[in-house]
Amino acid sequence: MATLDDDINSGVMTGRLRALAADHALSVLVVDDDDLERTLIGDRLAQRGIKVGEAADGAQALEMLRREKVPVVIVDWHMPVMDGIEFTEKFRAELPGDTYVIMLTARKEAFDFERGYQAGVDDYLTKGVPEPELIARIHAGLHTHSLRVQLRDARAALQLATRRRDGS
């Protein structure tokens, strides 16, 4: 039976990631004040054909996201200017949409997870996560984003059909 590691190493996951990310100029935004952390994640994703953007803090990330929508954001909790929690709350309030937000942080207490989810993150990972799991979560995020877009479009089509039917 194939494992997740087998799928990633054989290129199966890479092909799926590329297919899910193909429609976007930028597929994943990595938000972390640690240059090395951003580079490591960015390089791993770029090797899989994923288009990656980088921001050093939440304020910079919000500016970027006001200009361009991104299917997946990976955000650290502790950053100067605007931390990951404040970023997520502002992002969800100002730019509601289909973006999947993954909190990737060193914080790992139960109340930290709860606070992250309350702020609006979709997924919560602790730093040091094995690469196959990170890739799988990004894959899940891209897939979830795709489903959210399809649902939004289906709702809009249904509303239009209902208005036409009702003559409004």
How does the language model describe each region?
Residues T39-D43, Q47:
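Charged docking surfaces used in two-component/phosphorelay signaling
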Residues M1-S27, D153-S168:
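Non-catalytic signal-transmission and effector/linker regions of two-component phosphorelay proteins
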Residues E54-V72:
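Acidic, metal-coordinating helix/loop segments flanking the phosphotransfer/catalytic sites
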Residues G128-L142, S146:
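C-terminal output helix
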